[in-house]
Amino acid sequence: TEGQVRAADIYNRKGRLFAQITYDQTQRPTHTRYFDQNNVVVIMENHLTGDIILTLEGKRHIFKSKQEFVVFYLQYRGYDTDRIIYNSLATPFLVAYALRPKNGRAEDVLFWQESIGEALPGNMKVAMKMPHRNIRIAVQDRQVYEKIQSLATPEEKVYFHNIGYIYDYQRLNNMNPEALILTNSDQLEQIEQLLTQLPNVHFHIGAITEMSGHLMGLNRYPNVSLYPNIRPAKVAELFDRCDLYLDINISDEILNACRTAFENNMLILSFKNTCHSRRFIADDHIYLPENVLAMVEKIQAVLTHTAEMGSALDKQKQAANQASLEQYKAIL
């Protein structure tokens, strides 16, 4: 039929064809063939049945599932499977379940990175009872961990560890009196109050689009710089230069701003109606719009006293559930 895709060729970065997907008349993928460097099919996956056919050393191996295929591969390669780290209770768990350790009892780690329902998943309960594989379950989100603790029995609780995240901080906070705001709207909560109450702070406001006349009108304040159609290089420069990020735009977040500010050790302040990412902002640093003067006082305090800035950044990292290398070494 005209306009329908019947096959798609997949190339690697060097331009070599390594796979081809075929589709039926309803545009549903039916088969994927994987080629070796001689353009010979070595793996064929049937998406309708789940079967995988592998041609290895002149012999055909037929697997009824991806789990069987992965188990065969790990055993064929001779990998040590006495310790498996995985983050899914689907195929990775089923693979671990099927593997028997060579030496005693295996020691696995499951990184649980999903939300949790009103009961522990069935496969999670099975994992805790495997006779041949011991498991520790690392939960990085604190709220998910707390919910799991409310659902688990005393016997199950010992398997769970709240471990948090390791962040790659790009620099230290230098207490520069410069604040960054990135926005694609001209609605910035309490911006004129902030500009007038903080004359010694320079505000850099960037947008990846044109700016409205309302926003361009802020140029009348001496302590503001506007960047319509801001370029990536200028964004990077401002994240490196400013030590405050104000999450105050009444619209969608752009450029992953809160996380980038967090990783640059910038203190992030926001309002309740503009907060885009509570994960990277301490509760104490989220204000009611009518309480803008409290935000002003906070900014003045952290730019005046090193201890105030240090304490505020510590709260921010605690909100983001920061972990240490030592915590990871203990579980890994």
Task: Report residues per predicted region.
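Conserved acidic donor-binding segment of nucleotide-sugar-dependent glycosyltransferases
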Residues: D283-L293, Q300-T306
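Conserved catalytic-core segment of nucleotide-activated headgroup transferases in glycan assembly
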Residues: F160-G217
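A charged, aromatic-enriched C-terminal amphipathic alpha-helix characteristic of glycosyltransferases
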Residues: T304-L332
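Conserved active-site histidine-acidic residue motif and adjacent donor-binding/catalytic loop
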Residues: I208-T209, Y227-L238
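A short, active-site helix/loop in glycosyltransferases that binds the activated sugar's phosphate group
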Residues: N123-V126, P131-E156, Y328
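Nucleotide-activated donor-binding/catalytic signature segment of Leloir-type glycosyltransferases, i.e.
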Residues: G213-I230
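Short hydrophobic beta-strand element within catalytic cores of glycosyltransferases
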Residues: L267-S270
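Acidic donor-binding loop of glycosyltransferase active sites
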Residues: D240-E253
